[in-house]
Amino acid sequence: MTLIQDAELKPRMGSFKKRSSSKNLRYSMTKRRRSSKVMSVEIIEDVHDAEELKAVDAFRQSLILDELLPEKHDDYHMMLRFLKARKFDLEKTKQMWTEMLRWRKEFGADTVMEEFDFKEIDEVLKYYPQGHHGVDKEGRPVYIERLGLVDSTKLMQVTTMDRYVNYHVMEFERTFNVKFPACSIAAKKHIDQSTTILDVQGVGLKNFNKAARDLITRLQKVDGDNYPETLNRMFIINAGSGFRMLWNTVKSFLDPKTTAKIHVLGNKYQSKLLEIIDESELPEFLGGSCTCADNGGCMRSDKGPWKNPEIMKRVHNGDHKCSKGSQAENSGEKTIPEEDDSTTEPASEEEKASKEVEIVPAAHPAWNMPEAHKFSLSKKEVYAIQEACNNATTEGGRSPIFTGVMALVMGVVTMIKVTKNVPRKLTESTLYSSPVYCDDASMNKSAMQSEKMTVPAISGEDFMAIMKRMAELEQKVTVLSAQPTVMPPDKEEMLNAAISRSNVLEQELAATKKALDDSLGRQEELVAYIEKKKKKKKLFNYW
């Protein structure tokens, strides 16, 4: 009881682990919340992993001590995403968090939704078809990109790189502030990841010129540094045999956790997509039944729970905030008063092994956040993700585009050009030498037969050398393309003179041909006249 009294007398002091050590205190606080106004609304499922809970709490305490935790970002799931992005390394995560706060201040990410007006959105979507459309069967928003229809040259003519980056950040902020909360309410559980579909049919070097690569590089840095761990799974559809072969090579440069989320499919992808996404939520051109005829087509409709006025009303009321799985019970712990000389120390090894861990219930009390996005995460809902924390890695997401995989596609396209004439047997042996997700029966059969074969190793230096050479060749093509298409006046004059002379010669040839025809006609008449005279002469001699 002494510990409880101390916690009540000093609600803003002491570590969370000390205050959470009392089982009775936890249950009493839970009861008070049940009678609160927040609990009067529909509960959103929130189950926290005990190990992740401790890691986030330690990270949160460290941020509080260094005054690096703004009230808006005092969010359990946001901190967990950053921890996963740095493999739960506290110092590296803290550095990443600090850089994120600095970037948001310099870029103006907190006000971009109100201040930025992207008037050229219709033209941009015309040359870069992309957008959210519906949700999958687990409630996550579905993001679609048709990379084969991207025209990066015309895209950069209707907008600038800086404006597109602003639009990209604005869409990311809208996703976290509007779309994820709406999906959380609709699914009755925490949602902060997306399902992505990349259609690579028709993808070539024309889709990824230097301007496109520069744009992808900037977007990839923004996403990876400031919006990590937002990709749940990705389907790359209409991938040819060359693409699938080179995917085996390129994925050796990626983290296994990332590759586990990426499924490369051929042109028979419809059944697999329908396993994950309901037919009514999938566009007709991807095998679904939705056309969004009244909204300008599926790629422009932005269909989803965020279009429902009732759901959006609940979002504005804060109903998407999690109601279970708390670490900190006292909102006063978010900031440290100036008169508080005590420091919050992380739990010792003895505390970690003590009974305090055992009394943590499966669903913890509510994570105490202000008006930030309080989502709840259920471990069983994560699809194709390795659950061990040690396997976590840095990963950027893409709201209108997951740029890390776009960079991968760009590299694969380049390699396709280089290995265009590889013999078929060599191609197949490389393609099926290691397991890669594919729904084609023939592909799976060949993969099983070649399971014991190994992929030829390609060093990073060789890969970069190929990319550098292709960049040089593309630069030369760009220079040639930049040359004026209008012929110089002197050469044009020479060409016109040659054409004029050719016309004269053609006329002379026609006149000569006519004269020759006339001569042949007269010759035939003379021959006929001579033959006639000969016959008359013979007849005269006969008589």
From Swiss-Prot:
Membrane-topology annotation of the record = Peripheral membrane protein
Disulfide bond annotation, renumbered to this chain: none
Q: Does the keyword Iron-sulfur apply?
A: no
Q: What does the entry give for GO biological process?
A: protein transport
Q: In which tissues is it expressed?
A: Specifically expressed in flowers.
Q: Where in the cell is it found?
A: Golgi apparatus membrane; Cell membrane
Coiled-coil region(s): 490-526
Which keywords annotate this record?
Cell membrane, Coiled coil, Golgi apparatus, Membrane, Protein transport, Transport
Q: Does the keyword Glycoprotein apply?
A: no
Cellular component terms (Gene Ontology): Golgi membrane; plasma membrane
Write out the ranges of the annotated region (Disordered).
Answer: 316-356
Q: From which domain of life does this come?
A: Eukaryota
* Start and end residues of each CRAL-TRIO domain: 120-294
Looking up SUPFAM superfamilies in the UniProt record yields: CRAL/TRIO domain, CRAL/TRIO N-terminal domain
Provide the primary localization. Golgi
Q: Name one Pfam family in it.
A: CRAL_TRIO
Q: What the protein does?
A: Required for transport of secretory proteins from the Golgi complex. Catalyzes the transfer of phosphatidylinositol and phosphatidylcholine between membranes in vitro.
Q: Which family does it belong to?
A: Belongs to the SFH family.
What's this protein's name? Phosphatidylinositol/phosphatidylcholine transfer protein SFH12
